[in-house]
From Swiss-Prot:
Organism: Oceanobacillus iheyensis (strain DSM 14371 / CIP 107618 / JCM 11309 / KCTC 3954 / HTE831)
Subcellular location(s) per record: Cytoplasm
Name of the protein in its database record: tRNA uridine 5-carboxymethylaminomethyl modification enzyme MnmG
Physiological role: NAD-binding protein involved in the addition of a carboxymethylaminomethyl (cmnm) group at the wobble position (U34) of certain tRNAs, forming tRNA-cmnm(5)s(2)U34.
Summary of subunit composition and partner proteins: Homodimer. Heterotetramer of two MnmE and two MnmG subunits.
NAD recorded as keyword: yes
Family membership noted in the UniProt record: Belongs to the MnmG family.
InterPro entries from the UniProt entry: FAD/NAD-bd_sf (IPR036188), GIDA_C_N (IPR049312), MnmG (IPR004416), MnmG-rel (IPR002218), MnmG-rel_CS (IPR020595), MnmG_C (IPR026904), MnmG_C_subdom (IPR047001), MnmG_C_subdom_sf (IPR044920)
């Protein structure tokens, strides 16, 4: 018999990277929130790599922070190394990456959760959903506790019917030998959800004392590290380096000789693995012309000797892993502390979701994170934040929030998932964003902080600082457009020292800054303004001026896209009644049920001719409706 254990506005199932963002956002918005987790000691656990950020992913962390989420704040307090990547390239692909101290990250996140006013945290295994009249009303745990809520968010990561694979060894488990969730997955199937099976893997961890670092290349952090969070004021300067080494022909021989022993290649593994984070077995088979592959040695924290062997994800037997490790320069005497393994798990086919991350089949039920077919902590956190905001909005009778593809990488990811689906673990890449010049590391706050403020996730004090920054940027651009720089000898000397061609005539400071050789500080030196502006404001002014033409073109593309997004598709549309649309397109449209013509145009199998017919049909319906009115 179940018992009523409490009533809430929002219940979050799981406390990984999606779960903590969901719970925190919902609670901050004023929703009475419950977060249930299998193990209170594993909140925000990092089961795989000890890092946050990187290309596209680092920008997602900035977006989370700009909206009022917490991943950026917590990693800023717990990193052992911080690096800005792609600094030699344009601002659209620059991204921050932090090496995390795993135990400290978890400790900081748990502290934040425990001290959030509207948030209750409980340890417990959720076995089934409470469904009444086709609407999700809560959850039931294995201890028969029934918790009721207006909205439920499931963020189970890789725990649903998780199975660990290593050679011929196979056993039910979540990451790091945690308990696995069986009944919740079965319950979702009972309610008609289409479930798929994915796989991910992790490499061995070795003892730092047994590594010969003299045979590797040092990878230090930045001298002046930047922050993920706009609220961080102090940086950690006591950084720990990572180290680079490589596989070789001997490593590849060991792997090739034992491929049939890998659960990846022996037929044991049924789940689809990640294309962009392949196992070492997969790399050797797919890229057999490559003589070597990079291996990064990444410390897992300040107070542990465990070192993560980035690049050697494997499901080979433990005995072969020892052999493989010892073939790598610097690791000849390395001792494995934890062996690598693959893990298979259940995921929900994401085309069953609305762009709010609420499920189409069960109103009131949301899903976020790896359960939706993604890979990576950052992708999970971004979805968790949006699911939390929308679940709270539903409970509090507020408008839902849907970020479009021009607003955020988070918007790109969610649109890809719910519109196109994915047949492998989805990873965010800069190439997935058609408007990536607008979705930069430096401007996440300008894109999203107004939204975070409107939904109650940004404090008044922070919003005041943000509006002042916006004003300073606009005022400085206006000021530079009014200042004329004449070609005096002093100015020509500055130009030559900067490697720029001499001025032929007087020019506005604004136009001069468009020259690639001239930074904001160089132009500022010419006009001797001595203004006290923050580095963030200077950076933003320079980028907006230098890339003005490209940004303008990108915004024109966005305007065209938004016209298609504004053409809403009626909820009761009958696709079978539309003459001329291809059969495959009708099937896909009925399955995805797009909200707009723009979303319909991005569905695989729906071609431009189908979109044109759909547009005409909708417009004719609108005309008929007006005539009848």
């Amino acid at each position: 018999m179940t018992y009523n254990a409490g009533n809430y506005d929002v219940i979050v199932v799981g406390a990984g990277h999606a779960g903590v963002e969901s719970a925190y956002a919902a609670a901050r918005m004023g929703a009475k929130t419950l977060m249930l987790t299998l193990n209170l000691d594993m909140i925000a656990f990092m089961p795989c790599n000890p890092s946050i950020g990187g290309p596209a992913k680092g920008i997602v962390v900035r977006e989370i922070d700009a909206l009022g989420g917490i991943m950026g704040k917590v990693i800023d307090k717990s990193y052992i190394q911080m690096r800005m990547l792609n600094t030699g390239k344009g601002p659209a692909v620059q991204a921050l990456r932090a090496q995390a101290d795993k135990p400290i990250y978890m400790k900081e996140m748990k502290h934040l959760m425990e001290n959030e006013e509207n948030l209750t945290i409980r340890q417990g295994m959720v076995n089934e959903l409470i469904v009444e009249d086709g609407i999700c009303k809560g959850v039931i745990t294995e201890t028969h506790a029934a918790y009721y809520a207006d909205s439920v968010i499931v963020t189970t990561g890789t725990f649903m019917r998780g199975k660990v694979l290593m050679g011929d060894l196979e056993y039910e488990s979540g990451p790091n030998n945690q308990r696995v969730s069986i009944k919740l997955s079965e319950d979702l199937e009972k309610h008609g959800f289409e479930i798929t099976r994915f796989k991910t893997g992790t490499p061995p961890r070795v003892n730092s004392h047994t590594i010969d670092y003299s045979k590797t290349e040092i990878q230090p952090g930045d001298d002046n590290p930047k922050s993920f969070s706009y609220e961080t004021t102090e940086q950690i300067t006591d950084q720990i380096p990572c180290w680079l080494t490589y596989t070789n022909e001997f490593t590849h021989q060991v792997i090739n000789d034992n491929l049939e022993l890998s659960s990846m290649y022996s037929g044991m593994k049924r789940g689809t693995g990640p294309r962009y984070c392949p196992s070492i077995e997969d790399k050797i088979v797919r890229f057999n012309d490559k003589p070597r592959h990079q291996i990064f040695l990444e410390p897992e924290g300040r107070d542990t000797e465990e070192v993560y062997v980035q690049g050697l994800s494997t499901s080979l037997p433990e005995s072969i892993q020892h052999e493989m490790i010892k073939s790598v320069p610097g690791l000849e005497k390395a001792e494995i502390m934890r062996a690598g393994y693959a893990i298979e798990y259940d995921a929900v086919v994401p085309t069953q979701l609305w762009p709010t991350l609420e499920t189409k089949r069960l109103p009131g039920l949301f899903t976020a994170g790896q359960i939706n077919g993604t890979s990576g902590y950052e992708e999970a956190a971004g979805q968790g934040l949006m699911a939390g905001m929308n679940a709270a909005a539903k409970s509090l009778n507020k408008e839902p929030i849907i970020l479009d593809r021009s607003q955020a990488y988070i918007g790109v990811m969610i649109d890809d998932l719910v519109t196109k689906g994915t047949n492998e673990p989805y990873r965010l890449l800069t190439s997935r964003a058609e408007y990536r010049l607008l979705l930069r590391h430096d401007n996440a706050d300008l894109r999203l902080t107004d939204i975070g403020y409107d939904y109650g996730l940004i404090t008044e004090e922070r919003y005041q600082r943000f509006t002042e920054k916006k004003q300073q940027i606009e005022q400085e651009k206006k000021r530079l457009s009014k200042i004329i720089i004449k070609p005096t000898e002093d100015i020509q000397d500055i130009m030559e020292k900067a490697g720029a061609s001499r001025l032929k005539e007087a020019i506005k400071a604004y136009d001069l800054m468009k020259r690639p050789e001239l930074s904001y500080d160089i132009v500022d030196q010419m006009i001797e303004s001595n203004l006290e502006l923050s580095e963030e404001v200077k950076e933003q002014v320079a980028i907006q001026i230098k890339y003005e033409g490209y940004i303008k073109k990108a915004k024109e593309q966005v305007d065209r896209m938004l016209k298609m997004e504004d053409k809403k598709i009626p909820e009761d549309i009958d696709y079978d009644a539309i003459n001329g649309i291809a059969t495959e397109a009708v099937e896909k449209l009925k399955k995805v049920r797009p909200l707009s013509v723009g979303q319909a145009s991005r569905i695989s199998g729906v071609n431009p001719a189908d979109v044109s017919i759909l547009l005409v049909y909708i417009e004719q319906g609108s005309i008929a409706k007006v005539a009848n009115d």
